[in-house]
Amino acid sequence: MRRLWPLALGSAIIIAVLAPLLLTNLILARGDMFLYFYPYWDARADALRELRLPLWTPELFMGAPFLANPQSGVLYPLNWPLTPFDAPLAVKISLGLHALLAWAGTYAYTRGRLALTSAGAGLAATTFALGGYVLAQAEHINQFQALAWLPWLLYAAGLPGRSALQRAGLTGLVLALAGCAAPPAADTSASTA
């Protein structure tokens, strides 16, 4: 139980900071989120609810390739449980969960690999997960999702007590998850940041 308190604290901080978005009927309603990502998320959810592989969508942009566009998020496993929700609510849930994922990864990396104190690791985690570098991508949800994996990438790459092959496998898994969340350019920025 004692090991869970940092995660509980991180959750409380994220909820407190993001409450105006997460706990109200407000939505992100400008730019790419409103005009691009909400329609994509709705089209993806419709296809997955119908158990249909969304190769093409005639409803968006006078027709567009869908599965071939990594920004659709079809192949990202953490998007699949969000299928029952409309796009604005699904995005809110994803933002909250990925902020927590970024917080937990930063905490694990700074506590386990950099040997910071619990307080130091918590401060580092809060600074990363709720700082400008990550939150600036909130309107580009796929890039936000990919960036949440960055601290886990650092953690996996240097995991003590594991063979080089195990570290490479874990690092590859984390990169694959980030790559399924966002197009290659965003994945590259996450892995080189």
Predicted segments with their positions:
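Start-transfer (signal-anchor) and selected internal transmembrane alpha helices
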Residues: 1-20
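Intrinsically disordered, low-complexity sequence elements enriched in Ser/Thr/Gly/Pro
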Residues: 1, 42, 90, 164-165, ...
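Membrane-interface starts of transmembrane alpha-helices
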Residues: 2-5, 86-94, 116-124, 167
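Membrane-interface coil-to-helix junctions
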Residues: 14-106, 126-148
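Membrane-embedded helix bundles of polyisoprenyl
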Residues: 10-13, 103-113, 118-193
